[in-house]
Swiss-Prot record:
PROSITE patterns cross-referenced by the UniProt entry: RIBOSOMAL_S8E
One GO MF term attached to the UniProt entry: structural constituent of ribosome
Descriptive protein name: Small ribosomal subunit protein eS8
Annotated crosslink Glycyl lysine isopeptide (Lys-Gly) (interchain with G-Cter in SUMO2) location: 170, 193
Domain of life per record: Eukaryota
Length: 208
């Protein structure tokens, strides 16, 4: 029997049975879940009603994540699934779905921050810089450009929770797209109250 999204196979509100008065219809069909995993990109196309296409992502390893407070969006690697409000099984099997909390690689955001503000981010005290990083952070600039960077530095403060994550090289992010429908795992970096909330949840889960 196929997966069906009808309601006439359920009992009535009064508890009585319903007699099926027609067979299953094409418009009542359902399809098996995509259960998108982390791995080299594998996407199937599905022909749907109206001749349209859906992109069923079976495996994904990168996504486009937006750092809201800094208006910076970068393509980055998805490392792990750490929390899912709807189902712990999806965390255990590392399944990518909408609104699951994942760890992403922080390198693209750190590179952007350091070139935009000319300030180090998430560096250990006294850590050696590579010549390229040295060039970006300690470059000789004209007075006019230096003034522009000094203006930017006034707003360069980021929260201590984010800074800790940058030191570990991984950021917590939330997936906002639907990988099994559009074939992408895009989302946003967690910040502020939302980040505090999910850190508490993850800690409570680990403590069990």
């Amino acid at each position: 029997m196929g997966i069906s999204r009808d309601n006439w196979h359920k009992r009535r509100k009064t508890g009585g049975k319903r007699k099926p008065y027609h067979k299953k219809r094409k418009y009542e069909l359902g399809r098996p879940a995509a259960n998108t995993k982390i791995g080299p990109r594998r996407i199937h196309t599905v022909r749907v009603r109206g001749g349209n296409k859906k992109y069923r992502a079976l495996r994904l390893d990168v996504g486009n994540f937006s750092w809201g407070s800094e208006c910076c969006t970068r393509k980055t690697r998805i490392i792990d699934v750490v929390y899912n409000a709807s189902n712990n099984e999806l965390v255990r099997t590392k399944t990518l779905v909408k609104n699951c909390i994942v760890l992403i690689d922080s390198t693209p955001y750190r590179q952007w921050y350091e070139s935009h503000y000319a300030l180090p981010l998430g560096r250990k005290k006294g850590a050696k810089l590579t010549p390229e990083e040295e060039e970006i952070l300690n470059k000789k600039r004209s007075k006019k450009i230096q003034k522009k960077y000094d203006e930017r530095k006034k707003n360069a403060k980021i929260s201590s929770l984010l800074e800790e994550q940058f030191q570990q090289g991984k950021l917590l992010a939330c997936i906002a797209s639907r990988p099994g429908q559009c074939g992408r795992a895009d989302g946003y970096v967690l910040e502020g109250k939302e980040l505090e909330f999910y850190l508490r949840k993850i800690k409570a889960r680990k403590g069990k």
